Each structure stands twice: as C-alpha cells, then as structure tokens.
C-alpha cells in the first residue's frame, strides 16, 4: 500500500470555496434596500434579486470564466487580403451581453417601474451582476451614461439621435439592445480632455442625421465592440482653424459601423495588453472621417457630457464595492473549509479579525453606494431637492475615489487570506486583484476626483447642505446609541458566561 500523498491522486485535497446565491448571501445589501424602498417596491425587488442572485452564481460565473480564458483578438485581414479590423470575442462574452439585456441592467433605470426608486433596484442588480460578468459591466456603464445623456436631448439633431438610439440602449431584447462606447482618452491624456486633438469637419448629406466627419486618434477605448459611442472633438472653422482648450470641445454621437456593416471609417490600430480586465476589448483607434452627429451646442461638449460621467462614476462605485463583496464572500467560505493548526481558519482569531475588518468597510460602502443610487433616482425623476442635488454632486466623486482605493486594498487582503492559493492563477483570485486596480483609474484617478470634489465645494457650494444633513443624521444615530449599548452589554454578559470555541484555537500547540 502506498503512503498517503505518495501519488497525485492520493492524500489531502482542499475543497474549493463555493459561491451561494449572491443576494441571499449579502445581508447588508438586503438591509440597505429594505431601509430605502417602500414596502411594495421592496417586495418586487427582493423577488427579482433573489432569482437573479442564483443566476449570477450558477449561469453567469462559468460564462465569465470562459470569457476570461479566451480574451478578444484582432483580425486585421480576411482570407483574401481585405482589411476588416474585426475584434473576435467568445460566445460566452456575447451571452453575458444577452443576459445583461434580458435582466434589464440598463433598462430598469429607464422603465422606472418604481419611480425614483428604480435606480436603487438597478444598482442593486448591478451589484450582483458585475462580479460574474467578465467586466461586461464596463460597456453597460457607458451605455447607461449615454442613455441618460440622450434622454435629456429635446431639440435639434440630438433629439433625432435620441429617438434612434435610446430605445436600443434601454431594450431588454438582446437582438435589439445596443451598448455604447465613451471615446475620450487620447494620446495627450484622459482626464485632461482640454488637450484633445480630434477634429470634426462639417459635411452635408451624411446618413443617419450625420453632421460632421471625425479625424483623430483615440488611444484607449473600452468596449470597442459597441454599436455606438459618445466622443469629443473640436469643430474645424471654415478657415481651417480649431478652438483650443476644453471650451473648444463639442460632443458627438457616432455609430461604429456603416449601413454596409463595415467599420465607419475607423481603423483599429491595436488591442491593449492590460494588467487586468482581459476579457474586455480595449483598443487604440484611428478615426479617418468617421460620420458623427453634433449633440448639444458647439463648444459645450464638456458640460453636456457631465450627465454621462455622473452615471459611469456611480457604476464604478458599485463595481468596486461588489467586487470586494465577492472576494470577501469567497474568503469567508474558504475560511470555513480550510483547517490550520487543528481548527477551521474561520476560528482563528487573527484571521477572523481580518475578515471582520473587511466586513465593516463593506458595510459602510454598501450603504453609501445605495444612498448615491437613491439620490440619482430622485434627480432622474425630478423629485430631488436642492440639498439632494448638492449631496449627489459631492458624493459622486468622493464615493468613486474612496471605494476604488478601498477595493484595491481590500482585494489584496482577500488574496492574502487564501495563502498560496490566492497567488495561483487558476483559482481566479489573482484576477480579482488585477481587475480591481482599474477602478481607481477609470472615470478619473483619485487626485482628479479630489479636485472635482473641491470644485463641488468651492464652485457649487455643495459642502454646506451635505454637512447639515450629516449632522442631522449623526444626531439621530446618537439618540439610538444608549439602546444599542444596552443590547451590546446584555450580549456581552451572556457571552462572558460561556467559553467561546475560538478561545483554544490560538496560539497553536507546539506538540
């Protein structure tokens, strides 16, 4: 008889962590929703999210793993030498897109079945969707942002574009559903759009309400397989000059393919080889006269696009929080399965303290993301007070910058909590850390968002209303402290009369 462990099929094998229904396993999310939603809305939303939490864990997760294993590739030429610049993705990536449409990840925010609370429902569903999506959540963020921007276009070419695109951006039918890009970053920079070089030349007679052709390089375009995009460019004057600075930028709508199905005068220079988000197609593009339509007033591109960016920053916040929630959920399950020094890892006090600290961080961030969603929903429906608007203006950059940094630090703890297994690629844990890193870069880095928060305070005078509300909430919370302390004291007294099972788990025996 061979000794245990003598062969690759003998000896100890560690059970892998298991993912249960992602909604039922997120107590803080459920509590936040129950607190924010009216009773009838809570009943509907709870049923929808309970069902979807199972789908995210069972159907979506294997699709996401497949999409990650087979990243997109660029095919420059067909068999006969014709330039095609086709980005090939896996069927799994396409199926995840279909699920996004079927589940109404974008549509919920525009169907408004629960009025101002629809954004809360939508963002809670995104919270469950994102960690199982192979970053399909990225094109959804830009799609939602474009939908919100176009929804506000009520005149001129922008209104005509909205009539064509908005029903597609908000559809639940996968055969109709469009996603949108957001082509801002150029070689000159991302957040500093004032140095953008793309030029728009007025041309008459273009199809699909086109008003201009675009010429320039877009250095970092995520979700390049989308059907349309919003982008910035400088309108060329009749004398060939272009206006400088951010005030010289105008906003344009462009469809990525012409009526013949070919790219609309777009050349894909290369796909980006990134640290993470490997399943997400990200490309460097050359616009060679791409037909586009001016949206909004000339030279007002940056103010116009603010409606879009507020949405994408909220998506970033939700994705950061939900990614860490997924990591902690797996770490907790692993801790119940992994035994060290004769006890489950979950009974080792130091490890338990580490997980508890992450849970505390997640609790606050989950409440924050849902609160921001509630404010956005009120603004969408015209029910936001002046204080609501001020709070949303300030919290949007602050929530994004804080949760993104929190996500990177927290995911590093998650990797460490798995020990060596957390450093091995085929467990999927290292990928979670790499993917978390982009969330502090997308939609503005920490410093850029800090400056935006400063503008909200100085220019928009948002701090006063926010502090006033914070003091009011703190006062209400303080009134509840005595009762909470009494309950804690009672629990402590009961606990002191019994010896907890973790008492003998540390330090480990040296025998």
Set out the residue ranges of the language-model regions:
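Internal helix-loop-helix
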Residues: 83-167, 171-176, 222-223, 442
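Flexible glycine/proline-rich, aromatic-decorated loop/lid segments
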Residues: 277-306, 420-446
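Extended amphipathic alpha-helical segments enriched in small hydrophobics
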Residues: 313-381, 464-489, 498, 502-511
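Alpha-helix capping/hinge segments and adjacent helical runs
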Residues: 4-8, 24, 43-47, 51-58, ...
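A glycine-rich, basic-preceded beta-loop-alpha segment at the flavin cofactor/substrate interface
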Residues: 114, 259-265, 269, 274, ...
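Extended, charge-enriched "interface" segments that sit outside catalytic cores
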Residues: 1-115
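Internal maturation/activation junctions in enzymes
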Residues: 155-203, 207-210, 370-389, 396, ...
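A short core secondary-structure module
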Residues: 211-263
């Amino acid at each position: 008889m061979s000794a245990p462990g003598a062969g690759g099929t003998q000896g100890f094998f560690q059970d892998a962590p298991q993912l249960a229904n992602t909604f039922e396993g997120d107590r803080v999310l459920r509590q936040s929703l129950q607190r924010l939603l009216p009773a009838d809305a809570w009943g509907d939303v709870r049923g929808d999210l309970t069902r979807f939490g199972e789908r995210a864990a069972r159907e979506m997760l294997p699709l996401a793993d497949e999409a990650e294993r087979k990243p997109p590739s660029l095919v420059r030429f067909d068999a006969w030498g014709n330039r095609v610049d086709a980005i090939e993705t896996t069927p799994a990536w396409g199926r995840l897109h279909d699920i996004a449409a079927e589940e109404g990840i974008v549509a919920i925010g525009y169907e408004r079945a629960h009025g101002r609370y629809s954004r809360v429902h939508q963002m809670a569903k995104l919270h469950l969707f994102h960690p199982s999506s192979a970053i399909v959540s990225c094109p959804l963020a830009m799609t939602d942002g474009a939908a919100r921007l176009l929804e506000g276009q009520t005149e001129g070419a922008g209104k005509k574009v909205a009539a064509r695109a908005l029903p597609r951006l908000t559809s639940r039918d996968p055969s109709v559903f469009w996603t949108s890009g957001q082509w801002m970053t150029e070689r000159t920079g991302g957040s500093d759009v004032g140095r953008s070089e793309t030029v728009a030349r007025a041309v008459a007679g273009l199809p699909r309400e086109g008003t201009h052709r675009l010429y320039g390089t877009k250095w970092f375009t995520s979700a390049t397989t989308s059907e349309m995009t919003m982008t910035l460019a400088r309108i060329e004057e009749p004398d060939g000059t272009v206006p400088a600075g951010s005030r010289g930028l105008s906003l344009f709508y462009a469809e990525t393919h012409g009526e013949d199905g070919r790219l609309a005068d777009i050349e894909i220079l290369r796909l980006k080889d990134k640290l993470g988000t490997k399943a997400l197609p990200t490309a460097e593009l050359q616009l060679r006269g791409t037909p586009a339509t001016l949206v909004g007033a000339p030279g007002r591109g940056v103010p116009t696009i603010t409606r879009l960016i507020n949405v994408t920053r909220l998506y970033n916040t939700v994705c950061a929080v939900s990614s860490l929630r997924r990591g902690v959920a797996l770490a907790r399950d692993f801790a119940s399965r992994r035994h060290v020094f004769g006890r489950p890892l979950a009974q080792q006090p130091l490890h338990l303290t580490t997980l508890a600290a992450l849970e505390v961080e997640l609790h606050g961030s989950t409440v924050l993301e849902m609160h921001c969603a509630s404010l956005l929903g009120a603004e969408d429906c015209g029910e936001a007070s002046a204080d609501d608007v001020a709070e949303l203006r300030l919290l949007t950059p602050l929530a994004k910058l804080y949760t993104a940094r929190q996500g990177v630090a927290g995911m590093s703890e998650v990797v460490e909590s798995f020990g060596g297994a957390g450093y091995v690629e085929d467990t999927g844990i290292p990928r979670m850390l790499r993917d978390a890193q982009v969330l502090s870069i997308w939609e503005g880095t920490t410093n850029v968002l800090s400056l935006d928060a400063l503008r909200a305070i100085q220019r928009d005078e948002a701090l006063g209303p926010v502090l006033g509300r914070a003091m009011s909430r703190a006062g209400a919370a303080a009134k509840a402290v005595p009762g909470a302390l009494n309950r804690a004291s009672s629990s402590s007294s009961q606990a002191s009369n019994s010896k907890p099972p973790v008492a003998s788990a540390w330090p480990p025996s040296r025998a």
